[in-house]
Amino acid sequence: MQPALRNQQSAGTIDELRALNARFIHNFVTSDVASHDAILHPCFINIWPTGQRWDRATYLKYWATAFDPDVIVYWDVRDELITVVGDVALVRSTNKHTRRRDGNEVTGMTMYTDTYLFENGAWKCIQAQLTAVAPEHYPADDTIVSVYIAGKLQARAK
C-alpha cells in the first residue's frame, strides 16, 4: 500500500516552501549556519555552476563566511517558482548580485533549484543546484521577492 501523497499545490504547502526559501536566503546573507543546518537533509549535496559537488559538511563550512556585505553590496531574490510533486518540491528562483572588487561593481544573476523532500513531517533541502544566467535571460525587476543591501533586508513597498 502506498502512503498518501500531500496535496501537491495547496496554498499552505506553497506558503511553507516560500517561507523556507526566504529562510534559506536569509541564512546565507546573515551567515546563520545553525538555522541553515536545520533545514538541510542529512544527504544534502550542493552542485555549483561548474559542476563541482560539495557534501553537506563542506557546504556548511563555506556557508559560515561566504557572504561579505562589503563585497556583495546588493542581493535580491526574484522569479520564484515552486512546484510540488508528491513529497518532492522544486523551489526555483534567481538571485541578482552586485559584487564590489577593487573599486569596481560587477552585477550578475544566478538561478538556483533547491530540491526539498517531505519526510517525518518536515520539508528538508536535499539538493541545491546553481546555474549562471546569461544577461538575455535575466528575469525582470517586477519579479523581485526580496532585496538585501549591504546585508540588510529592505522593507518592501506595499
Where in this protein do the model-derived segments appear?
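A beta-strand edge to alpha-helix "cap/lid" segment located at domain peripheries
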Residues: M1-A38, I45-K158
